[in-house]
């Protein structure tokens, strides 16, 4: 039996109500605070290319993630949570700006493609390649700069990916402390991207920890930062590179993990199983690092006044488990865009809950601004809203639509309708009954398809008319 077709009036009313709700919710509710008025600390953890079911709490049966499972048990697990792009750079840009990639200007990757074909850049050539010289428009206002209004100290430990030149680096964008790498992927031990050293401390390149596993380094630096700033509000942003494949010239590129973690899983019987074990071991190593961060919050008696957010930057790749979703990283199907997410905020969000509401990573920026008691930047259009009432179970999500574009690939979700037009496949799907996007309803629901395409065209025009941002726009 086919799903009833909404009238055009109902369809437009849905979109109008969505816009009004998004606008109104930016006023948001007051956040709970400790006695004395100290705003909550913030710990944002992002994994890299983790699958939708690569967590025990998300139904994974083969991978050990006790600390993330515990985090879900102490807070809320989001099942209907999306990122803004099916790969890393634009997704991270949206997290830190609260804006669509097409609005903030970072709507594609800053990367070189020759290494995909075995080419190693000499230093002089690498210095003028897109990966080296592109970065997020310096007019964009990032989250740490806004939080400074409330006295926050902000640190990032892990993958930056928003530009390598000094003007693009974290300290120039509002962060106070940075240790990590500046591009899309590295070797977990040499810290090189296809032979190019890529680790930085603050504004300077460093090879001080070459040979040490990156997950351990990012854990170490995040622990240091939280210790040093325990007496003031802080934003600790920990974007791990796990379980992304290592950026090495050899193929197939491995996911690197410490031998002890690999050996903790059953011995693989094939090359494919071995690659899956590497992936699982990297996730479990990251989970242990996250466990150390959460344990320190308890030790410092900060856990009750700290918001913890975890999600994957995009859908899983390689041997990641995206079931029951269709597709993976780089694709416009659910497996490239819908990701695992959980939020813990004692006093504001009930523990042990599950939220099935339609939400996105663009809701994080306004949520954290409101939690800190600071206003979003003047004159900046945000594309999200404070999702605290939704996570607390006090209100339905006002989000009714989400739109995506990656070069020639396009997709939109309106209510439970999902439209995809891409090189990997196209169709119209009813996510309320078909989360795996297996049944194309384009022929059965031509009016719905036409209306979603019309809405996408309107959104495209809206993005084109927004104040232009580099590095890709012509202005």
Where on the chain are the PLM-derived regions?
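Anion (oxyanion) recognition and catalysis
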Residues: 72, 148
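N-terminal secretory signal peptides and thylakoid transit peptides that target proteins
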Residues: 2-19
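Short, surface-exposed beta-strand/loop micro-motifs that present aromatic residues
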Residues: 144, 225, 408-420
């Amino acid at each position: 039996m086919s799903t009833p077709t909404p009238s055009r009036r109902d369809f437009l009313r849905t979109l109008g109500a969505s816009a009004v709700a998004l606008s109104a919710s930016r006023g948001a509710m007051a956040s709970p605070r400790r006695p004395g008025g100290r705003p909550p600390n913030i710990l944002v953890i992002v994994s890299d290319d983790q699958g939708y079911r690569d967590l025990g709490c998300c139904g994974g049966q083969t991978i050990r993630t006790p600390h993330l499972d515990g985090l879900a048990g102490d807070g809320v697990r989001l099942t209907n949570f999306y990122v803004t792009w099916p790969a890393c750079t634009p997704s991270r840009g949206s997290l830190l700006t609260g804006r669509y990639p097409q609005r903030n200007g970072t709507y594609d990757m800053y990367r070189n493609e020759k290494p995909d074909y075995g080419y190693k850049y000499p230093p002089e050539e690498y210095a003028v390649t897109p990966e080296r010289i592109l970065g997020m428009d310096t007019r964009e206002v990032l989250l740490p700069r806004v939080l400074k209004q409330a006295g926050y100290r902000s640190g990032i430990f892990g993958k930056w990916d928003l530009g390598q030149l000094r003007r693009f680096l974290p300290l120039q964008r509002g962060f106070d402390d940075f240790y990590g790498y500046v591009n899309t992927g590295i070797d977990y031990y040499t810290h090189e991207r296809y032979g190019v050293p890529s680790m930085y401390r603050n504004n300077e390149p460093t090879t001080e920890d070459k040979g040490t596993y990156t997950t351990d380094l990012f854990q170490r630096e995040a622990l240091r930062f939280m210790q040093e700033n325990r007496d003031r509000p802080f934003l600790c942003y920990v974007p791990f590179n796990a379980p992304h494949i290592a950026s090495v010239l050899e193929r197939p590129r491995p996911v690197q993990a410490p031998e002890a973690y690999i050996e903790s899983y059953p011995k693989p019987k094939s090359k494919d199983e071995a690659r899956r074990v590497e992936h699982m071991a990297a996730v479990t190593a990251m989970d242990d690092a996250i466990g150390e961060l959460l344990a320190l919050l308890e030790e410092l008696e900060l856990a009750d006044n700290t918001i913890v957010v975890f999600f994957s930057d995009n859908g899983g790749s390689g041997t990641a488990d995206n079931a029951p979703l269709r597709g993976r990283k780089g694709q416009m199907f659910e497996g490239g865009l819908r990701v695992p997410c959980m939020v813990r905020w004692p006093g504001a969000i009930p523990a042990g809950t599950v939220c099935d509401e339609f939400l996105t990573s663009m809701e994080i920026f306004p949520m954290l601004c409101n939690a800190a008691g600071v206003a979003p930047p003047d004159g900046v259009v945000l594309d999200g809203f404070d999702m605290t009432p939704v996570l607390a179970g006090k209100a339905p999500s006002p989000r009714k639509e989400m739109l995506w574009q990656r070069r020639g690939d396009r997709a939109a979700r309106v209510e439970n309708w999902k439209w995809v037009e891409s090189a990997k496949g196209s169709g119209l799907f009813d996510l309320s009954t078909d989360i795996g996007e297996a049944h194309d309803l384009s022929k059965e629901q031509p009016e719905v398809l036409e209306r979603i395409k019309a809405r996408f065209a309107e959104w495209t025009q809206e993005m084109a008319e927004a104040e232009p941002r580099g590095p890709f726009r012509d202005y």
